[in-house]
Amino acid sequence: ILAGFEHNRRVMIQGFHGTGKSTHIEQIAARLNWPCVRINLDSHISRIDLLGKDAIKLNDGKQITEFQEGLLPWSIQNPVALVFDEYDAGRPDVMFVIQRILEVEGKLTLLDQNKIINPHSSFRLFATTNTVGLGDMTGLYHGTQQINQGQMDRWHILSTLNYLDPSQELKVVMSKLNNLKGEKNKEIIKNMIKLANLTRVGFANGDISTLMSPRTVISWGQNFKIFKDLVTSFNLTFLNKCDDIEKSIISEYFQRCFDIEIDNGESGSAS
């Protein structure tokens, strides 16, 4: 990411959900005092949304049609770090618009306006994805699609962001759970992270199809504060999202970490 900022490289960050891909870029940009704009490339983002469109405006009491620039032309002309989240979920027609600016000196041509935009010297481009552009083989990321390899070739750097070391993850989770202080709560959070790591190993080995991200651990801690019960908060945060066939395996992970048995017949009341 730092190489992207310093040397104007196009950087793509790939990793599982909840690893902090976008946050990582945002925090580095904040420490560099570099303005950062995030665009979520869901399937409803269109070419018009990115490039701009004609809009009706009032001028001296009269309606006139005026071109309104989208976020892409605006970002290119400013010292901005533009981050495309969920890059592998973008529509093909939108991806080809982005392809124009993937080259470092790539100019953006607005055909409707007969205008060519030169990128600002401090414009930077990043993307975050769950896959590496080859489609989703795990079944975890429905809605993602294969990315044109001609476009993938234009990204200068592709880095994978894995889950943190448990000691580092503990610091991150503790910083987000200010209301859970003290050694007793710290030990509980350590075991939460231990359980999360067991689900990640189980997923990697093909034993289970869902895993706990740091985001899930933080949500569990927040729900534990609300419900004052480890099992209830765990059920409501994670276990209820899992396949019934796999719940016994995940319950075993829980027992291993907390020495508490979970009754899989009770998955948390809706009330």
Residue ranges, per PLM feature:
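AAA+ P-loop NTPase catalytic core and its hallmark functional loops
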Residues: I1-K186, K190, K194
